Regions:
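Short helix-loop capping/hinge motifs at secondary-structure junctions, enriched
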Residues: 100, 125-128, 243-247
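An extended, acidic
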Residues: 5, 46, 121, 136-256
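Buried hydrophobic positions in well-ordered alpha/beta secondary-structure cores of metabolic enzymes
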Residues: 31, 78-79, 182, 208
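DPxDG-like acidic metal-binding loop motif
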Residues: 67-123
Length: 256
């Protein structure tokens, strides 16, 4: 995947527009190449007798003999970064045994620039480059030192109560990588205050849960019952610990 995608990042060839993908975003050549790599691997599984379906941000839903398990594919999460040559984008894969976010039983987030790999299997913990991990320990457990936000400019205004109390602010432009880093304690809180696709969260929210973190919408409601498709959207507030999540809710004025 990295050999196919990285040479196209920040190039005219990689930015070449193709069509509008199933998720509603403009597909570029870099997206197509990345998706082709993933689908080639999945087609090999199907040829060996595995039965499943695939839901891709670019190609939509395809059946390979069974409705479930369902493989979610975002071949380039952070595609605007990739298009512009900004080295912060990744591959997101999730496997579900049902229609909702709570049905996610395996997840992969791959940083396509560094090769760092984050994986999780439901009830078997989260791993970074093959090693089990939990969030970094901090002495000031309830203070938001490093806040990460979803990348639209309006997010800063909507999340102003968090921004004002955070020590520093980061905006990466990749949902999957932002949540993965939060799961390990790299960010104290990640907030998407405007509705985003639940599809984009699936793999990294499993990482977060398996590492002991907490995720809700901005009202403090659980995300598990939400359908995992290309249409369903939700706000997101997540943190590596319950204390940090509770502090973020408090700053947003959400009673618990």
């Amino acid at each position: 995947m990295r050999r196919a995608v990285l040479p196209l990042s920040g190039t005219e060839a990689g930015r070449a527009p193709l069509s509008v993908g199933a998720g509603g975003d403009r597909t570029i050549e870099l997206d197509r190449v990345a998706e082709d790599v993933v689908f080639a691997e999945l087609a090999e599984l199907a040829e060996r007798g595995e039965k499943f379906s695939v839901l891709s941000e670019e190609a939509g839903r395809r059946a390979f003999g069974a409705e479930y398990p369902l493989v979610l594919v975002d071949p380039v999460d952070g595609s605007l970064n990739a298009k512009q040559g900004v080295p912060l984008f990744g591959l997101m894969l999730a496997v579900l045994d049902g229609p909702t976010l709570a049905d996610t039983f395996a997840g992969l987030v791959l940083n396509l620039n560094t090769g760092q790999e984050w994986t999780a299997i439901r009830r078997h913990g989260a791993r970074r480059d093959g090693k089990r991990y939990t969030p970094m320990q901090r002495s000031d457990r309830g203070s938001i030192e490093l806040l990460a936000l979803e990348s639209t400019p309006r997010s800063i205004k909507v999340a102003q109560p968090l921004v004002e109390r955070a020590g520093k602010l980061r905006i990466l432009g990749s949902i999957a990588l932002s949540i993965a880093l939060t799961s390990a304690g790299g960010f104290d809180v990640f907030c998407a205050p405007l509705p985003m696709r639940v599809f984009d969260m699936a793999a990294s929210l499993l990482l977060l849960a398996e590492a002991g973190g907490v995720a809700t919408n901005l009202k403090g409601d659980p995300l598990g019952p939400m359908r995992c498709d290309l249409e369903t959207r939700s706000t997101l507030l997540c943190a590596p610990t319950r204390e940090l999540h509770a502090e973020a809710l408090r700053l947003l004025g959400i009673p618990r």
